From Swiss-Prot:
This protein's name: Ribonuclease P protein component
Family matches, as SUPFAM superfamilies: Ribosomal protein S5 domain 2-like
Catalysis performed (reactions): Endonucleolytic cleavage of RNA, removing 5'-extranucleotides from tRNA precursor
Naturally occurring in which organism (per UniProt): Alkaliphilus oremlandii (strain OhILAs) (Clostridium oremlandii (strain OhILAs))
Family statement: Belongs to the RnpA family.
Length: 114
């Protein structure tokens, strides 16, 4: 994923958390906010409660790859944050991918044409 499509700054995360719409399932929480651009910016958060750094990094890599492969299905113009819950530690790639798609559908962010 290109650097321009990433949420990295603390102020960007705070803005999304403050003015967001959110939804959750057993693996993830999603926060979205319209950003005024013609592309999405995405951030991934994994708390220290989830596990040690190796585990957190693995979960972030799985989240990133799941989103990257399904990015063309997602409507553009949003800041999106995915927050991993403790149950992500034991989840497979397919479970994480289906959780991401489930939340994106619930938030009406999946293009109907794809």
């Amino acid at each position: 994923m290109k650097a321009i499509n990433r949420l990295r700054k603390n102020e960007d995360f705070r803005k999304v958390y403050k003015k967001r719409k959110s939804m959750a399932n057993k693996l993830l929480i999603i926060y979205i906010l319209e950003n005024g651009y013609n592309f999405n910016r995405v951030g991934f958060t994994v708390s220290k409660k989830v596990g040690k750094s190796v585990i957190r990094s693995r979960v972030k890599r799985l989240l990133n790859e799941s989103y990257r492969l399904n990015n063309e299905k997602v409507k553009q113009g949003y800041d999106i944050i995915f927050v991993a819950r403790n149950t992500c530690v034991d989840a497979s790639y397919k479970e994480i991918e289906s959780a991401i798609l489930h939340l994106l559908k619930k938030m009406n962010l999946i293009n109907s044409a794809v």
